[in-house]
Amino acid sequence: MQYEEENKYTRILGEEEERFDNAVRYRCEQKVINRIDGVVASHSETQRELILTPNHNGNKYWFKVDAGESFAKISPENMLAALELVDKIDVIKSQAEVSVDPDEGFINRVLNLEGIREKWEKCKSKMYRKINPAADGGMDEFRQLDKFTDVVDAHFCDEPTFRKELTGKLFFDVFFDRYLVGAALEDCKFERTFHSFLFDQTPIEATVTQAVSTDKETGLKKLSRYISFDDQRLIRYVRHHVMNIYRDRYQPFIKYNFTQYNFEFYHDTLLSEDGLPQDIKVNIIEEVRNNIEILVTYQIRRLK
């Protein structure tokens, strides 16, 4: 039944595809600063263009996302190859055709998982072809690549797993929202899942404060969201999980014991008259107090 349902959605998407003539181009820019004991340890920047094509028929909404140009840079430079590889895989994952919930606007199905998986398999084959097992250290490199690709392969095992992976990424997390389906926006508080940058995308439940206003400079509707959180609210399992990752990954070189986990999240969206975002700005501060800190700034700008 699952495959019949997927084929049904794919056929519908194909029938509607010829009506996708209203593509909107966005430029996404992300900056990440890592500090250890107050000292900057790394600084990275990624830039990417995404082309979004919306379509709806009655209460069914589809969105097609295509990737344009992508750039990455990082300091120290010896981390560039790893960043470029992650960026390349993110570009593959981002080329998604999705349906969204007609009431809430979040992604409820990825319609082209097979096509995305095929792109990943081609990318993976190219990576293996670059390794010569007979060369000095070639077998070690081969084994390391096996471990890496096994992790990535797991993201594509089925549609729910890939959808969870996709919606954990900032663009798909903050872009797909109630305004895409014309839902009413109002001042309120609600629960949402925050995916940790420091701790392997560990899901953490938090309360979001939302305010709706009019932007003074542009006159556009403005949606503002804010989270301030400390580890007093972490449930025991999540706190234990976070502490274990800290102990295994960070403490060997930081030395200091785990103190207190905090994060702050700021998210402003300007909505154009057609209901699509004109500009989205996200700021995230996440830390283990006094020991390690990550600062993320992310902007999505609609291009002319």
Spans of model-derived segments:
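Signature of exported/secreted
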Residues: 1-273, 277-304
